[in-house]
């Protein structure tokens, strides 16, 4: 099995110079040419940042709405009551509730990809931190998932909102579309994501902020993108 995977990766990586940097348009073409899996692979981006992840004040976190969506049907849960619950439902939320939703999640039933909460619900939702936190879906004010404007938050989530957060090695990973997208739409999503990460640069970060940008598909190899393709 391992040999089959290795052989496949060798075939996919043919024609790619691992030490070279490619323009964004060329990188997208190469990525799509090598996406040969029998499903619509996700276009993934990895950004190596010049931050010290050991310091909390250099954490990079935010949210960006992909201009062309992500190609994923996102299920949204909203912790809200009364009129805010009605607004969430009307905006298209899949699950809406208060104490009842709390009990469902506490019991381990998490049938959603994104979680939104009104501020008054956070004392309750905060008790679910050990469940929602590790999954990266704990409502957070900084990424707009703790809000009184639940309708807008739901619509943005449904239309392609992507959360990002730097990891221990100072790297950010995210899925930003599907290989079935038109090349231009993938490029636009990449540019939007990179721009959002650049805007989220910590004021205390020193030196070069964006060190490397790499694109890949779910089953593909990494393709390094020339930073001159971006305003970094």
From Swiss-Prot:
CDD domains: Ribosomal_L1
Gene3D superfamilies, alphabetized: 3.30.190.20, 3.40.50.790
GO CC annotation: cytosolic large ribosomal subunit
GO BP annotations, alphabetical order: regulation of translation; translation
Molecular function GO terms recorded: rRNA binding; structural constituent of ribosome; tRNA binding
Subunit structure: Part of the 50S ribosomal subunit.
Role, per record: Binds directly to 23S rRNA. The L1 stalk is quite mobile in the ribosome, and is involved in E site tRNA release. Protein L1 is also a translational repressor protein, it controls the translation of the L11 operon by binding to its mRNA.
Family, similarity comment: Belongs to the universal ribosomal protein uL1 family.
Name used for this protein in its record: Large ribosomal subunit protein uL1
Lineage: Bacteria, Pseudomonadati, Pseudomonadota, Alphaproteobacteria, Hyphomicrobiales
